[in-house]
A protein has these predicted regions:
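Metal-dependent active-site segment of extracytoplasmic phospho-/sulfohydrolases and closely related
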Residues: 1-17, 44-48, 64, 368-371
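Substrate-binding rim/cap in mid-to-C-terminal beta-strand-loop elements of soluble/periplasmic
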Residues: 24, 31-150, 321, 325, ...
Length: 427
């Protein structure tokens, strides 16, 4: 049995005004078109789009168009453009091909009970001794052989970051919420927002499947009924408080899920530690100490976190100790030692502290060689969440994307020396 769902909730509006590094949006960092164009020119102009040098994303207007004929996009649970996806089911020898689409309302939680029913098995009460939660879904197997069968899913709620909706027997009530994916920075008024402030819309999907006609003013009693039902379903499914998902990405990035450790010791050949599991070198006060042995005019990466679309790195370039903080391509901060390292054994330290303790606040960076300060600088804006959703921490070389353009054409730019160990500690 092959079940294929095409989509990621909806088209992505995180490109905002069009971006060369989409995690600017997730980090809530405002930027201008002029900044993007200037950075793109440094990368080679339009030809750099779609290459490993960028992490580009289309303008949010294309996301809305991509969700057509529905309203909305990913990160909006209020409208079907952010929740509805086509699904295909294939079971050769058991399901005959049928060009007639099934229009019954269903949710992804319905897939497991569907497979259970098709295979004639039941939901296990325990797995490895762990009691299992009850199944919430409703099997859609009944619709496989009967395109016109009456739908069996009566109710379904949706919620993300305060954007929410509730479906019930052909009707849907929708509240957009305080955050629009295409608006940069913190939502206006978010510090005093409450869900009670939001305006609700009402649609009769049985007659208006694309949510073109808001009936809230015509059927206030129906809207009130569905709003109450949303509160019941949200409570039953542990989805309260409404808008709780705004806490980390918008208001308190320091509370994001992260490793419990405060210190690490890495071997000199450690590579491919996902950023989610690695030390937060770009937004937590920290000290990195590296014991190494190098020849004259040594070259190579000491470590890097993130990738081409954003990250930080420390490397040697003709012996010069160099630190670079790449803020999603639109801002690069480089700190260098005044003189190259001499051949031999050394201890390199990179100390990072906040100049202003706030999400996205500026960072002071100090480079030390064998206990002596050899360089310092300030990163004007830091990344409050993370640099990359798919790149890593590497020691002694750089895999994935090149954080610095200084070694982009020399990847993986392995150190032509030896790292005996790297110690990282939060301050």
């Amino acid at each position: 049995i092959v079940v294929y769902i095409w989509g990621d909730n909806g088209s992505s509006g995180e490109g905002q005004n069009g971006t060369i590094s989409e995690l600017l949006a997730q980090n809530g960092i405002p930027s201008t078109v002029e900044q993007h164009i200037a950075a793109l020119e440094e990368l080679g102009g339009l030809d750099a789009l779609g290459t490993p040098a960028t992490d580009n994303q289309y303008h949010a207007a294309w996301a809305w168009a991509g969700s057509s004929p529905y309203q909305g996009m990913k990160l909006l649970a209020s409208h079907l453009g952010g929740t509805r996806n086509p699904m295909f089911v294939s079971w050769p020898g058991h399901i005959e091909p049928d060009p007639v689409p099934r229009t019954q309302f269903h949710h992804v939680v319905d897939l497991v009970p569907t497979i259970y029913e098709i295979l004639g098995i039941s939901h296990p009460e325990t797995v490895n001794g762990v009691p299992q939660d009850p199944i919430d879904g409703t099997s859609l197997a009944y619709s496989i052989d009967d395109a016109g069968a009456e739908g069996r899913r009566r109710t379904q709620y949706f919620e993300i970051m305060g954007s929410r909706s509730i479906y019930s027997d052909g009707w849907m009530a929708s509240a957009t919420g305080p955050r629009l994916p295409w608006v940069q920075g913190m939502p206006a008024g978010i510090q005093t927002w409450t869900p009670d402030q939001d305006r609700w819309e009402l649609y009769h999907l049985d007659e208006d499947w694309s949510q073109a006609h808001d009936l809230a003013a015509d059927h206030p009693e129906k809207l009130a009924e569905l709003k109450e039902l949303f509160a019941i379903e949200a409570a039953r499914n542990d989805a309260l408080p409404v808008g709780g998902g705004l806490w980390v990405p918008v208001m308190h990035p320091e509370d994001r899920i992260s490793p419990p450790y405060t210190a690490w010791d890495f071997a000199g050949d450690t590579v491919r530690i996902p950023e989610f599991c690695a030390p937060a070198l770009g937004n937590r006060p920290n000290r990195v100490e590296i014991r190494l042995s190098v020849p004259d005019a040594a070259n190579g990466v000491l470590y890097k976190l993130g990738g081409a679309g954003g990250g930080l790195t420390c490397f040697l370039l003709d012996g010069v100790l160099t630190y670079e903080y790449n803020l999603f391509l639109v801002q690069r901060t480089v700190v260098r030692s005044g003189a190259p390292l001499a051949a031999g054994d050394h201890t390199v330290e990179i100390v990072t502290t906040y100049a202003e303790l706030r999400p996205g606040g500026p960072l002071d960076v100090v480079l030390r060689l064998d206990g002596e300060e050899v360089g310092s600088g300030t990163v004007p804006v830091s990344a409050p969440l993370l640099f990359s959703a798919n790149d890593c921490l590497d020691v002694g070389r750089a895999y994935g994307g090149a954080v610095s353009r200084a070694y982009a054409d020399r990847m993986p730019f392995a150190l032509d020396g030896r790292i005996d160990g790297m110690h990282v500690a939060y301050l």
